[in-house]
Regions:
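Surface loop/turn motifs at the tips and blade-to-blade linkers of beta-strand repeat domains
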Residues: 10, 19-23, 73-78, 121-125, ...
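Short loop/turn segments immediately following beta-strands, especially the blade-tip
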Residues: 1-3, 52-65, 107-114, 156-163, ...
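Beta-rich catalytic cores
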Residues: 25, 81, 129, 176, ...
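Short loop/turn segments immediately following the C-termini of beta-strands
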Residues: 43-44, 53, 99-100, 109, ...
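Asp-box/WD-like beta-propeller blade repeats and closely related beta-sheet repeat scaffolds
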Residues: 1-28
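Residue-level detector of Asp-centered blade-edge/turn motifs that repeat once per structural unit
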Residues: 33-34, 89-91, 137-138, 184-186, ...
């Protein structure tokens, strides 16, 4: 069972989009691969907040788990709407999907520092509904989901030396692909199509990154998130 919250962090601010960014709206928190930092994506204020993780904090002591980092946050372009963040398997790069602008931002990552190196479009129709982002286990390809219009997955190759993205394809999916996951062996990609009431199963070409629908849909009422148990 979960214990009561040991601490609560509150944020202030707003963003450029008056309908979607009237206040802070944390959409994802991610501990860095080195376990030393936590990044929190704030869709409402166009920021990635940074915290230092205290490894000595435990449920039975009074040590604070999170301490404000320096800088306290990283700002992205106004109206972007940062949603989900993921790290490359080598831990050297991070990638952010922006819900409102439909872009992916690539960062170099080193000991808590994010350095923006590229912005590339995942959504090219202005749907303002980009959703999830994941990298293949081999670190060669990145996938980003889009909803509301042209529902599907943008597919990018990742340059092995500098982490830069190149778009290599687009896979149309069922309606509202809110979340997806790549199987641990990298062979398949499962998409939670919320408004189609199915989890679609795609075979993944490990050489090209492209996807093939193998027509083995799993019927589920309003699927929104898929996780594998270690």
């Amino acid at each position: 069972a979960l214990l009561p919250a040991s601490e609560v962090v509150k944020f202030k601010g707003s963003g450029a989009d008056k309908e979607r960014q009237e206040k802070p709206h944390l959409h994802c928190v991610r501990i860095t691969p080195d376990g030393k930092y936590l990044f929190a994506d704030d869709l409402g204020t166009d920021q990635i907040h940074k915290f230092i993780v205290n490894p000595n904090a435990k449920a039975d002591n009074e040590d604070v788990f999170l301490k404000e980092g320096s800088p306290a946050s990283y700002k992205v372009e106004a109206g972007s709407g940062p949603r989900h963040l993921t790290f490359a398997p080598n831990g050297s790069y991070a990638y952010l999907i922006n819900e409102l602008s439909g872009t992916v931002i690539a960062f170099e990552y080193n000991d808590g520092e994010l350095k923006e190196i590229q912005t590339i479009a995942a959504d090219t129709v202005g749907a303002k509904g980009s959703g999830d982002i994941h990298i293949s286990p081999d670190g060669k390809f990145l996938y980003a989901s889009n909803r509301l219009k042209a529902d599907g997955l943008a597919i990018f190759s990742i340059h092995p030396e500098n982490g830069m993205l190149t778009k290599v394809g687009y896979q149309l999916t069922g309606i509202h692909p809110r979340n997806f996951i790549i199987t641990p062996n990298g062979k398949y990609l499962l998409v939670a199509c919320r408004d189609s009431n199915v989890i679609q199963v795609y075979e993944r070409d490990t050489d090209t990154g492209l996807l093939t629908d193998i027509r083995k849909d799993i019927k589920v009422d309003k699927p929104v998130c898929i996780k594998f148990v270690p």
